Amino acid sequence: MEELFFELKQKVYEKLDINLDVSDEDLYKVIDVCIYEISQHRGLSVHNRELLRQQLYNSIKRLDILQELLEDDDITEIMINGYKDIFIEKKGRITKWNKQFESREKLEDIAQRIAAMSNKTINEAIPIVDTRLADGSRVNMVLSPIAIDGPVITIRKFYDTPIDIDRLIELGSITKEAADFLELLVKCRYNIFVSGGTGSGKTTFLNALSNFIPKDERVITIEDSAELQIQGVGNLVRLEVRKSNMECDNEVSIRDLIRSSLRMRPDRIIVGETRGEEALDMLQAMGTGHDGSLSTGHSNSSKDMLTRLRTMVLMGIDMPAEAIDRQIASAIDIIVHLKRMRDKTRKVWEITEVCGYKNNEFELVPLYKYVEEGEDKNGKIIGTLKRQNNSLKNTEKLEWSKDTGTMQCKS
């Protein structure tokens, strides 16, 4: 089949005017003619004809063998390490795919196609590009000479229907009790930071939290690459950074967007990921009347997240460390730390209240902690997110409801 595919592909190119932007309909007509001609003296089943038809179309007009992976809803991440080595993450497991691109040049061509989809350029002069596909999937591409063994393309897929908190409860990522607690905090405008390592599900969890925001609020989202899918908020402004290119320095950074958003009369600001000097602007926004703001960051623990935020602030301004720490403690109310477990599942590892800064240390109070109890026969981790013997100290935004017998947002 492989030799036949390349033979057919050559015949299709011979019949096409390669300088012409051929329509899908015309391309399929040429492909069908070529398949018919070759099937006259080769036995081809209907299944194989249809398979070759789609493979040829994908190779010429779409993203070649990548298209098959992009259309598989069970695949969450695609990792291409040169044209021969393709790895996929499917249902939490990373495996090597049994297919490869026909050549290094073909993979480079695919990288060019992906970049062109969003009017970007990738070449030896600009060997690193971050972009996204039409469906919103996030793409990072690196070409030689930076990528020694050939083009590296990493795709994190995007789903039309975002995972909500109910689905996270079903998956065992969080308990119903903890989810209800976080829903109350979001609605009552607590500033929440979601932390965790790479692949721990920070963006997914941030999106789930965002859907607790009251629908009558004005929300500004700021992202490096637009991924959030906030449902039901009509007064929503989505902002995305713009990186500089070779022609001119026209970069618009997250820091620029945070500063601009403050003049847009936001009720809340959501920053997809805080990872640089924009941390100071985010903290100032949280601490100056934009309660209920949300963001994420890379860290190994709740405490580590606060330390990393200090380092981020110092990237943009020279300030005493203690002054920065006090501002962090004043701005952030809650940290939700996520963890990707050894069985590849994602869990809320701890929910921690930031109560202040005293004696050169952050005052952190654990409210929920994941307690591991063992493994089942398949290696799946058994455990639960347990409420700790600590009450929420900052209750200024809450009041007791006599009608429901529960806490509610202060009116």
Predicted regions, residues:
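N-terminal accessory targeting/assembly segments
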Residues: 1-122, 133
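Conserved, well-folded catalytic cores of nucleic-acid-processing
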Residues: 11-18, 37-41, 59-69, 81, ...
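P-loop NTP-binding catalytic core
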Residues: 72, 85-188
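Switch/coupling sub-region of P-loop NTPases
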Residues: 189-192, 208-331, 337-339
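The conserved Walker
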Residues: 197-198
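Conserved lysine of the Walker
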Residues: 202
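NTP-binding/hydrolysis catalytic cores, primarily Walker-type P-loop NTPases
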Residues: 344-411
